[in-house]
Amino acid sequence: MAQTQVKATEGVLEGKDLSGITVFKGVPFAAPPVGNLRWKAPQPAAHWDGVREAKEYGPNPMQEPIYGDMNFGTKVNSEDCLYLNIWTPAKTMKEHLPVLIYFNGGGLMAGSGSEARYAGDAMARKGIISITANYREGIFGYFAHPQLSKETDYKGSGNYGFMDQVAAIRWVKDNIEAFGGDPNRITIVGESAGSMSVSALMASPLCQGLFAQAMGSSGSVMGFQKIATLKEAEDKGVALAQKILLEKGKKTGKKVGKDAGKKCLDELRAMPAEELLKLASVRALPVYNVDGYFFTEQPTEVFAKGNQTKVALLVGGNNQEMTPMSVLRGKQPTVENLKEGAKALFGEENIDGLFRLYGINSDKDVLEQPGVDLASDMFLDYATWKWGNMHKLTGGQPVYRYRYCHPRPAMAIKGKVAALAGGVVDAKEGAAPVRRDNGAVHSADIEYAMATLPTNRVFDWQPEDYMVSDIFSQYYVNFVKTGNPNGLGLPEWPAINGKAVAPVMQIDVETEKAADYTCLQFFRYPVSKESYKEKRNTCNARKNADSADL
């Protein structure tokens, strides 16, 4: 029988035995960020007397049903959301097991540690402690404003969701020995916005010494553009506050001045969370910023100087992260329309060279792999590659790259279509059947990596899916245990450090080494007619490199 009572800093917790492992759900790692604590750094959780039951998930963070396909373990959303969940196989405090902390994806505006695909029981049965932790999202987690900045010693604001993640890691480091864990063997992990968070945590001075390894899947905060300055974030916060007050004024009949958004903090703090969420109604990636506290400079500058947390890193993404339709924005799939969609990011003068580099030469290329490669790089692939590459150059620690390639099987249910967050939404009446993906779409890797395929009943999982999951999840577990994904019976996975042609592990039914590439790594500067051929040839050489040479 596993030990179900544990003494944490704040008091005694009573968990639940799951046939050899113990799960503790809804464990508070910080005070509820409500009332006057709205838009403040997380504060310590309160102590309690007696035994606190930890058998049910705490509330999800406040969020709108943006994706419509997330499978939560609780139906309750609340501003009081700073809870974590622990799955431990330890029988005593003295086992010193390695620890995984998973931060959910969802664009920093949706998602929760209660989602079934992140559940840690399968990983715990492989000999590690697995943890999920919530953090504030959307306007509750990433709202900057001049009035908020005046309240802080560092004269900045925003980034509260990232600070929640720091608080969760600190709580785990301070308490995990009581659950049989090793505070010096913590690995932080995330997918999509969770992966962006891991890269941000590595760049923050608040995290030095808090974790031993890091893993990221499909995302980083080091993309094509710099993150916002504090002034830019504050200005956007004022504009959002003005929008909220105007929307409320329409309902109440109250007249709102043109500068009301500049001095409205008391009113916004007093607003019920549900009302604030609806009035803000922002369905875009929140604005995080160089606030002078969580971020003291641009993350790219931190990594360029070698000032990031220097730990082993396992990083990668999927081979079909995004469809070209995201670049086309509703227009027909032609080269000219795809160029028009890409110009906003790359500029008119660069677009022809860029398309030659990708091999997008005719309309048929637009929806095929060349167009998919461009759309995926624009979405998250390039940012993910840049994170791993910069850490390779200045981190002084091993970096392991992967590319997840295995497509999900056919759906087990009818009348649905797959959505971005991993689940399904209702198919539109009369819509043409959606063809099965040729590769791994965004978020498709999560259940395979976390060995949680049975929790997702949308897809008709086949033996080959479980085989891929066994391989991928074992790489994950090995990395958490040792900082190296390699292990007995697995294909060799070399680090990319010191390699002219960096190796990437292609995770599939046939898992093997290949060449690590993204065409955009050769597109750091405008492509002249004289240089694009050389760049294109180099990109193709990396694509076609013989794995035996890696």
Range-by-range predicted roles:
Residues 1-159, 183, 459-472, 482-490, ...:
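Non-catalytic accessory segments of hydrolases
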Residues 69-74, 154-159, 222-228, 299-300, ...:
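Active-site rim elements
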Residues 70, 174, 200, 208, ...:
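Substrate-access "cap/lid" subdomains that shape
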Residues 81, 154-177, 232-235, 239:
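Alpha/beta-hydrolase active-site loop
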Residues 95-99, 126-131, 182-186, 207-213, ...:
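Loop/turn elements at helix/coil->beta-strand transitions in domains of secreted/extracellular proteins
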Residues 105, 164, 192-195:
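Active-site loop->helix "elbow" adjoining a glycine-rich segment at hydrolase catalytic centers
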Residues 184-225:
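Primarily recognizes the serine-hydrolase "nucleophile elbow" in alpha/beta-hydrolase
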Residues 385, 389-550:
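Mobile gating loops/cap/lid regions near enzyme active sites that modulate substrate access
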